[in-house]
Amino acid sequence: MIEQLDLFPDLVNKKNDTVEIQLSTEEKIKQAVRFIRSLGAMHNIALAFSSGKDSTVLFYIAKEAGIRFTPVHNVTTIDPPFTIRFAEKHGCIIKRPELSFLDLVEKRGFPTQFHRFCCNQLKKKYIADYLLLGIRKDESVKRTKCYSEMDDVYYFSKKIFTNRFFPLLNFNNNDVENCIKEHDLECHPLYYDAEGNFHVERRLGCIGCPLQGDRGKRDFQQHPILLKQVLRRGILYHKRLGRTENDAVLNLVYNLFYSNSNYKNYCQTFQGLFNVNPWTILQKHFQITQNEVLQYLPKPKF
């Protein structure tokens, strides 16, 4: 295993063994380049390229490091527009899943923040023995807690038997924005507004992801056809279990609007304690009617 702290000497306070981030963006880039170069003797190195701003910066740094690596993009089938095209521009190998997201909904139901089986099925697959990822602690409070130690720059995944490395772990949003602007990096089109201004605070992700909260709802407002397709496949799942169309819609509406409250409330949805007509909520927020959804139910695949 690599001695992580020796690769990042400027980040460590030797007196009390605490990690203090006091580097400029360019110094952090140099440290990341040095770290990636230390992996150069290893074989079968890949870079997970999501087409987001972080993987764009990581791709640039890996190129600067001069090592051989293979950029790989996992298609989720509910990616934002232009995502696959942007990955192809970076020479990525495009990996498509055996089952689409809609297939997974029909097979396993709607994903929730408590049960995100779609991530494991569509994203967390074996790619290579050594994998570079653009994960940053700064992205969320949860990740800050999860990757609190410098040793977390390296992690071995037993699920997919892959050594995972996070060269951008201590980059913050300012570092990412500075790197993109200083080195004139082209980012995914959705990071730019109509005037061409770059917005580092924007995030790419699967359309309608339950972890995105209000943004997930806005995604479906912008993509109502996808929401109808998700509903139809979810209805097939619930009907296979002996439930009704209303049960399926109730489940999805709760996942979109209420499941962030607490797990107890989530469990109560199947005990008749949810007193709002879910079709009414769909009509109000997405202008989707019951007839539009039920009229075009596909044939079951499972």
Would you name each region that the model predicts?
Residues E182-P189:
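Extended serine/threonine-enriched, polar tracts that run as long, contiguous segments within proteins
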Residues I2-D6, V12, Y192-F302:
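ATP/NTP-dependent adenylation/nucleotidyl-transfer catalytic domains that generate, transfer
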